[in-house]
A protein has these predicted regions:
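Conserved SF2 helicase motif VI
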Residues: 141-167
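Conserved strand-helix element at the start of the C-terminal RecA-like helicase core
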Residues: 12-16, 58-84
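Interdomain hinge/linker at the junction between the two RecA-like core domains of SF2 helicases
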Residues: 11-60
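Conserved two-lobed SF2 helicase motor
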Residues: 115-130
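Conserved helicase motor
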Residues: 71-75, 92-106, 124-127
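Long, low-complexity intrinsically disordered regions enriched in Ser/Thr/Pro/Gly
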Residues: 98, 109-115, 166, 170-175
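Conserved RecA-like helicase motor-core motifs
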Residues: 27-34, 87-103
Length: 175
């Protein structure tokens, strides 16, 4: 019943446009496309989980950098967090319906502020769309993907949570 509907999306696809048209039968859609600007972002691809893990640990342990990690596999999250815990790196892992832990619940209530408390945040698709980390606490984003549990568009969204990061390091399992 709305007189006007405005949709803004950086990666809207034809399926979404078709759905919107089906909701507004007989109406002409006005589509405004804006050419993307070069934000000077770089993506580095790794041949294995171990290779990216080694790179990430070098940057965290030796260079004292902060990293936002995103994974589509709970086992990857557990592996990475176990290593970071063994090395006494202050970290938090946000995985599926596990917000019963106080620090996880607090993080999900205010990820922008809470993320500043950690050298490493390990996230999954459990962090809802619409979450944006706008501060410059994180030096880079690392993505560990199996390719079996999230769609490429979702992986893209997961990687883009930390808006100011220009450096992305990725492993995507080809099996």
């Amino acid at each position: 019943n709305a007189e006007c509907v405005i949709v803004a999306d950086a990666n809207i696809n034809q399926q979404t446009l078709d759905f919107i048209e089906s909701c507004r039968l007989g109406e002409q859609l006005n589509i405004v496309e804006i050419d993307p600007k070069n934000e000077h972002k770089t993506a580095h691809l790794y041949n294995s989980f171990a290779e990216l893990q080694s790179f990430m640990l070098q940057r965290v342990m030796v260079e004292n950098q902060n990293v936002w990690i995103t994974c589509d596999s709970k086992s990857h999250v557990q592996t990475l967090q176990a290593i970071l815990n063994d090395l006494d790196v202050k970290n938090i892992a946000i995985v599926g319906n596990e917000n019963v832990k106080k620090e996880t619940a607090e993080f999900l209530q205010n990820p922008e502020a809470e993320s500043l408390k950690y050298q490493v945040v390990i996230s999954t698709s459990a962090i809802a769309s619409g979450v944006s980390i706008e501060h410059n606490h994180f030096d880079f984003v690392a993505g560990f993907f199996t390719g079996s549990s999230v769609q490429p568009t979702d992986a893209y969204q997961m990687l883009g949570r930390v808006r100011q990061c220009k450096e992305f390091h990725l492993f995507a399992d080809q099996n």
